Amino acid sequence: MKVSLLITLAVLGVMFVWASAAELQERGSDQKDSPAWLKSMERIFQSEERECKKMFGGCTVHSDCCAHLGCKPTLKYCAWDGTFGK
């Protein structure tokens, strides 16, 4: 029983490697271009990211403040919104 299970797992492993190699060969140069494309996308997303305002930091809307903080409408600063958790 253990031997047949081991043989089955080995065959499945070989089939997985074979299918992966065939797919990699089919893609060709796409695989070579991917890292450069990912690097360019990384730069785009980093430029859009911005830090959140911490407690008592200046803000204009709630989304400026970090998690569990909200923008107070009168003095425009980030303060605890009364929530807990993640």
UniProtKB/Swiss-Prot annotation:
Spans through the membrane: none
Keyword terms: Disulfide bond, Ion channel impairing toxin, Knottin, Secreted, Signal, Toxin
InterPro entries, sorted: Huwentoxin-1
One Gene Ontology CC term in the entry: extracellular region
Disulphides: 52-66, 59-71, 65-78
Short name of one Pfam family: Toxin_12
Family the UniProt entry places it in: Belongs to the neurotoxin 10 (Hwtx-1) family. 28 (Jztx-11) subfamily.
Name of the protein in question: Kappa-theraphotoxin-Cg1b
Native species: Chilobrachys guangxiensis
Organism ancestry: Eukaryota, Metazoa, Ecdysozoa, Arthropoda, Chelicerata
